[in-house]
Design a protein with these regions (language model features):
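Catalytic machinery of carbohydrate-active enzymes
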Residues: 1-251
């Protein structure tokens, strides 16, 4: 792999201004030729300043805050589709002389994941339609009411041509899933059954994913699966839709 990660201990040795200077020294020792700031917050601005003073080319993301503020303000909203975050990241690299072709389709290329790897857990697909449902998100404002989502689960569970897979994690989400699985025996909870790699494999074999504005929307997008995304406190115009997802599939 040509990607490596360097952790920032922001509550320990990299805490505060003194800690940022320590982090800068550690990063500078790597002798980077360029610095691309995809975050553009106070800490990264300071680090970029230090690199710039050391004559290392730096480029930072432009987040388009003005357009987003007009989109979310209470009155006189301006509902204009903002540039996607993917395009903004590519713009940063282009500033440094590395133009990016945004032609990615799937981590599996034109194929899907190895079905034999997940079949012991999922069973054979046969002629069934496989629907993934990811009903939760990190922030409550993004979650469609659970009792209403259960109605969706019940609807598809009653269809003998459909198999529903529930995606989530954590104790509270598992309690909800366990309740649904008990009521609807054809529904399968995937919590604790697959790791991240094999869960992506399963997603590649879905016919569609129903998700909030959450990580699962983006994971399904990585394997080129259509996502019906439900937006609550956020808006698909803000530039955070899943990769190559269609606006017509947003709710």
């Amino acid at each position: 792999a040509n990607v490596s990660f360097i952790g920032a201990d922001l509550t320990g040795k990299h805490k505060g201004l003194w800690g940022l200077n320590t982090l800068y020294s550690e990063l500078k020792a790597k002798r980077f030729d360029y610095v691309a700031d995809f975050h553009h917050v106070l800490r990264t601005k300071y680090l970029c300043l230090r690199f710039w003073l050391a004559n290392i080319p730096v480029a930072s993301i432009y987040k388009g805050r003005v357009g987003k503020e007009k989109l979310v303000r209470r009155r006189h909203k301006v509902l204009e589709n903002q540039k996607s975050s993917f395009r903004r990241y590519a713009d940063v690299l282009e500033k440094l002389g590395f133009p990016v072709l945004l032609n990615f389709s799937s981590i599996y290329g034109d194929e899907k994941g190895n079905f034999a790897e997940i079949e012991p857990v999922t069973g054979a697909k046969d002629n069934l339609k496989w629907i993934g449902i990811a009903p939760f998100a990190k922030h409550m404002g993004k979650i469609y009411p659970i009792e209403l989502q259960e109605q969706v689960v019940a609807h598809f569970a009653a269809d003998p041509k459909v198999k529903v897979f529930l995606f989530g994690g954590g104790k509270s989400e598992q309690e909800v899933f366990d309740g649904w699985v008990a009521k609807y025996p054809t529904v399968v909870s995937m919590i604790g059954k697959l790791n991240m790699r094999t869960e992506l494999n399963l997603m590649s074999h879905l016919d569609v994913m129903l998700s909030m504005d959450s990580a699962n929307m983006h994971l399904a997008s990585l394997v080129n699966i259509p996502v019906i995304s439900v937006w609550g406190a956020t808006h698909p115009y803000a530039g955070f839709m899943g990769w190559k997802q269609l606006p017509v599939n947003t709710v």
